[in-house]
Design a protein with these regions (language model features):
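Catalytic cores of carbohydrate-active enzymes
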Residues: 218-336
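Active-site-adjacent bridging/hinge elements
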Residues: 21-32, 63-89, 117-128, 175-192, ...
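Active-site cavity-forming subdomains of large catalytic enzyme subunits
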Residues: 110-239
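Conserved small/polar residues in nucleotide/adenosyl-binding loops
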Residues: 348-354
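N-terminal leader/propeptide and maturation segments of large enzyme subunits in energy/redox metabolism
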Residues: 9-14, 18, 26-34, 211-215, ...
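Acidic/polar, glycine-enriched structural segments that form the non-catalytic walls/loops
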Residues: 1-86, 120, 127-130, 160, ...
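Solvent-exposed loop and edge beta-strand segments that line ligand/cofactor-binding
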Residues: 83-92, 135-143, 194-205, 264-279, ...
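Alpha-helical support elements that line or immediately flank enzyme active sites
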Residues: 52-65, 88-111, 151-157, 210-219, ...
Length: 358
């Protein structure tokens, strides 16, 4: 925040100049972190891949403050001597599904600081972070990914932050009439003729609503629980029983035509980094409800099986992020991360396809 603070940072973080000693200390620090997870394998390549991936999960969020606690808030103001470590690089659409929950297990000591950072961002910009970078809100990606991330910390019982303030931040962020939410509250869903990437936005909002509902239930806020739980079922508007896909629905209640579940046009259709094959499964919070849309477990499981064996061709100007395709299952992209585990709910046999897929 100042030349004086820069000197303090240097004195605290690098009081002397010994490159070899500094490199050795960094090696020891990373070794201690990576040893938090042990695997057994004789495959050196698999071990290297695993620990490289584990390292990547620890690169962000990153500290964004001086050693004396000074930091620049998302409102542009400088805050002095904060009683918590301020963080940034909240790539939440990318991390709330797996990396953020993993952090609660591997780095529980960081959770109070991360939660307090998110609450201060809420106070400074009026909502929880969506995709915060260097103290600035980028509003990148769809949905309200800060909500499930903060809700996870509340529901796992981490302390060091105000749970009532956390709930206020969750609720207010879920009720803001921006980024398609105003349309969602008017129509009950986001119409595809009025908003781009409508299916993706709405289905992510539905998942976030479920997270708000769970915190409301935990805190005894029954009316809010009922409201957000019902709103979390908005995904049902998009399910077409004829094609058995999630499809864009316009403001007149008509499915978008023509329809091609293999097509994905980056930032210019009803989905985000995906297509109907991939987004149809984005209901991890209500799998039984999604099974009901299909008419039962047999039809659901049959469609899920098809996901892994249909053509891997992506039609249209698809994003390169839709990667690692096995059929239309995109192993390399976020909306597919949970998909193989859906078998644990739908499959009735002892040997789950999840085992072989994983």
């Amino acid at each position: 925040m100042s030349i004086e603070n820069a000197r303090l940072n240097m004195q605290a973080e690098l009081p002397g100049w010994d490159f070899e000693a500094t490199a050795a200390a960094a090696d020891q620090a990373w070794d201690a972190e990576l040893q938090k997870v042990r695997i057994e394998t004789s495959d050196d390549a698999a071990r290297r891949i695993f620990y490289t991936a584990l390292y990547h999960t620890m690169v962000a969020p990153s500290e964004f403050c001086d050693v004396n606690g000074d930091y620049r808030g998302s409102d542009g103001k400088i805050y002095r001597a904060a009683p918590f470590v301020n963080y940034t690089t909240f790539s939440l659409w990318d991390t709330y599904r797996a990396a953020q929950p993993l952090m609660t297990i591997l780095h529980p000591e960081k959770m109070p600081d991360i939660a307090n950072t998110m609450l201060h961002i809420y106070r400074q910009q009026g909502k929880l972070p969506v995709w915060h970078l260097m103290g600035n809100e980028t509003d990148c990606m769809v949905g309200n990914p800060g909500i499930p991330a903060l809700a996870d910390a509340v529901l796992k019982g981490y302390g060091g932050f105000d749970r009532e303030q956390a709930y206020e931040a969750l609720k207010q962020s879920a009720m803001l009439g921006e980024r398609g939410m105003d349309l969602r509250m008017k129509y009950g869903y986001i119409p595809c003729d009025l908003f781009n990437e409508a299916v993706a936005y709405d289905m992510e909002y539905a998942l976030a609503d479920w997270a708000v509902a769970q915190v409301a239930k935990e805190l005894g806020k029954t009316a809010d629980y009922d409201y957000f739980l019902e709103r979390s079922k908005s995904y049902r508007h998009f399910f077409d029983p004829q094609t058995r896909f999630m499809r864009g629905l316009d403001s007149k209640g008509r499915f978008r035509t023509p329809f091609n579940p293999f097509r994905s046009t980056h930032r210019a259709d009803d989905y985000c980094e995906g297509n109907a094959w991939q987004y149809t499964w984005l209901v991890p919070h209500d799998v039984e409800g999604l099974i009901g849309c299909f008419g039962g477990k047999e039809a659901f499981t049959g469609k899920l099986d098809s996901l892994f064996v249909v053509s891997s061709v992506l039609e249209g100007a698809a994003s390169p992020d839709i990667s690692g395709l096995i059929g239309q299952y995109a192993h390399g992209n976020e909306p597919s991360h949970h998909v193989v585990y859906l078998y644990t709910v739908s499959y009735t046999h002892l040997t789950l396809p999840t085992n072989s897929r994983v």
